Amino acid sequence: CGESGLFITKKRYAILVYDDEGTRRDIDGKPGKVKAMGLDLKRSDTPVFMQDFLSEVLLKVLQKGTEDEILDSITEFRTDFKSRPGHEKGSPKRANKIGHYQRLEQKQGKANMPGHVRASINWNTLKRMNSDKYSQEIVDGMKVIVCKLKQNPMGYTSVAYPVDELHLPEWFKDLPFDGDAMEETIIDNKLGNLIGPLNYDLQSTKQKNTFNNLFDFGGSE
């Protein structure tokens, strides 16, 4: 039996279940079990910390949390997100056909390719330009994080880095990461897909955040 539900379309919904075919799920202080269909809570292109937050927001909605409570938690999450280092705001991808596109570009100059491939090749190029012999080269099949960049002398719009790279080089950390663009991809789009149909004032969580940042005199620059 379900206690409450969020129904977006016929094949996209979530229910808070307290009786799962005779097994009680609302015991030991737990609210029940969330059954979700088609909501992309665990998409591989979503960072784990965002997956966890989406699940948290969904549970609040299913537990009949008020709009203000949910918007406050989103505002707080935005603040935490902004304080993260730029490279932690990227999107996970799997690098495919890197070798193929690198060879293609060597033959014919600039070639069209998927964004995550371009970002991976940009990492390899910057690694060479910085005479970095220690960081891993991105090759086919590697898991990478793709980060968006602000305007820069190289004209790059994004750069990837290997998930397994334990010591990110300083030349990489110093790149001009575009936190606002990544916030839109990671937070705005994902929340819009999940709770957009509820017509909550998600825009207000941005305005509140900007206001708080402007008047947070105790914070560091």
Q: What are these model-derived regions, one by one?
A:
Residues 1-221:
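DNA-dependent DNA polymerase catalytic subunits
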